[in-house]
Amino acid sequence: MKMITTDLIRGSLKTIVLKLLKENGRMYGYEITRSVEELTRGQIKLTYGALYPVLHKLEKDGILVTESGNYNNRIRIYYSLTEKGESVVTEKIREMKEFIDSLQNIINPQPGLNHA
C-alpha cells in the first residue's frame, strides 16, 4: 500500500488527534504517532514536526491540557481533552464524516444526480 500524502494528512490531523484522545483518555506524542501508524496499517506516518504544532495549538485554544509524567527516568508530556475539547471532537468528527461523504459523491458519483 502507498502512504497517504502529507497534504491530505495536514487537513485531517486535528480531527485524528482529537479522536484518539477521546478514545484513549490521555496520550503522549510518540504514542499518538504509533497509534496512527498502527490504525492505518502504515499508510499514515505522522512526523513530530506536524504533530507537535497541532498539539500546542489545541492546548493554547483550551481544547487540550498537558500533564507531565515520569517513565523510566524520562519526562513524558501527556495530552488529554478538556471539557471544551470533548464538545469540539464531536463537532470535528461530524465535519469529517460530511467531508468524506462529499468526496465520495465526487469520486463515485451516483447515477441520476445532477453534476452541473
Question: Language-model features: where?
Answer:
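Short, Lys/Arg-enriched N-terminal segment that forms or immediately precedes the first helix
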Residues: 1-6
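N-terminal helix-turn-helix DNA-binding core of bacterial DNA-binding proteins
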Residues: 7-50
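A cross-family signal for key residues in well-ordered alpha-helices
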Residues: 19, 34, 56, 90, ...
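Basic amphipathic alpha-helical segments that dock to polyanions
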Residues: 51-58
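Glycine-centered, phosphate/nucleic-acid-interacting loop/turn motifs that mediate DNA/RNA or nucleotide
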Residues: 62
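Short beta-strand "wing" residues that participate in macromolecule-binding interfaces
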Residues: 66
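Basic, amphipathic "hinge/linker" alpha-helix immediately C-terminal to the N-terminal HTH DNA-binding motif
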Residues: 71-93
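Amphipathic alpha-helical dimerization/coiled-coil segments
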Residues: 87-116
